[in-house]
Amino acid sequence: MAGNTLGQLFRVTTFGESHGLALGCIIDGVPPGIALSEADLQHDLDRRRPGTSRYTTQRREPDQVKILSGVFEGVTTGTSIGLLIENTDQRSQDYSAIKDVFRPGHADYTYEQKYGLRDYRGGGRSSARETAMRVAAGAIAKKYLAQKFGIVIRACLTQMGDIPLEIKDWAQVEQNPFFSPDVDKLEALDELMRALKKEGDSIGAKVTVVADNVPPGLGEPVFDRLDADIAHALMSINAVKGVEIGEGFGVVALKGSENRDEITKEGFQSNHAGGILGGISSGQQIVANIALKPTSSITVPGRTVNRFGEEVEMITRGRHDPCVGIRAVPIAEAMMAIVLMDHLLRHRAQNADVTTTLPRW
């Protein structure tokens, strides 16, 4: 099974399944001399882990990460960093009734078509549980980018169902269980989640992720454009069905005179491009949005077939998120950080001696 590695110089390889013994990852390309402890990774893992509020899955996983290699006396050595998180709250019996049934909207059917078999326990490798290791790896990238270059990466929920959320106050994002920057909408979000729980249904969401203080020049035309790699990384997150960079699909309704980001002596006058021009960072804030589908793990009955071609009624049991967009916030930050870290190392490897007299804003 290929496709488990992301990045070229900063390379993250993950392994493990939802109901396996553990999840793990190997991270190559981490510069030596970075102060690093398990506590540095745990903060973001705690933001992602299940069972932290009544709005997310009640699977209780502590997600305690262990650093197995690549750190000596509290600093990175420059060698491969190995990380491990044990699974401790699996309930595989919850899935025994569906081992021969293809859950609609899930990867059951496609995994079995591809491999001829599948791990039906919680989706196996296709489960979003795998993203815990991405968050751990992303925490390393976030720390390096912040300490060495002042790059700050943040994400928040900006829509749930038909409830739009304005980015009013980033300080409020970590103060509520929805990662919402709009505290005026918290009551509406709570009411929606209560209604979904009563109905046994789920809802989609939009998450916005931004990166500030990114230097100009990151990105490798033409096939490794920065926006292409960011979109690739974000699209790989479970349940993501769409990615926008900057204005995204909104550019369809704009004229060229409206969409172009004019430049004056004071700098760019707008940021419809989302901080990336020609696949290369401009020095502006990088902005991306992701659309996440409503999970298909719901108790509303639906039709499907089993492995024998028989039509059956499907009701998904187990512990699931009514809105996967909530816990996608730290995952989106991690994927943005991994891509920026990789491109920063690649840029420095080739262009470390490049200097220009162009202004930077």
Curated annotation (Swiss-Prot):
Pfam families, A to Z: Chorismate_synt (PF01264)
Query: Could you tell me the Gene Ontology terms of the biological process aspect for this record?
Result: amino acid biosynthetic process; aromatic amino acid family biosynthetic process; chorismate biosynthetic process
Keywords recorded for this protein, A-Z: Amino-acid biosynthesis, Aromatic amino acid biosynthesis, FAD, Flavoprotein, FMN, Lyase, NADP
Under catalytic activity, the entry for this protein gives: 5-O-(1-carboxyvinyl)-3-phosphoshikimate = chorismate + phosphate
Q: Which GO terms describe its molecular function?
A: chorismate synthase activity; FMN binding
| EC numbers on record | 4.2.3.5
Cofactor(s) demanded: FMNH2
Q: Which residues bind FMN?
A: R125, S126, S127, N238, A239, G278, K293, P294, T295, S296, S297, R319
Query: Source organism's superkingdom?
Result: Bacteria
Q: Which GO terms describe its cellular component?
A: cytosol
Q: Which Gene3D superfamilies match?
A: Chorismate synthase AroC
Q: Which family does it belong to?
A: Belongs to the chorismate synthase family.
Which NCBIfam families does this chain map to? aroC, PRK05382.1
What protein name is recorded for this chain?
A: Chorismate synthase
Whichever gene encodes this chain, its name is aroC
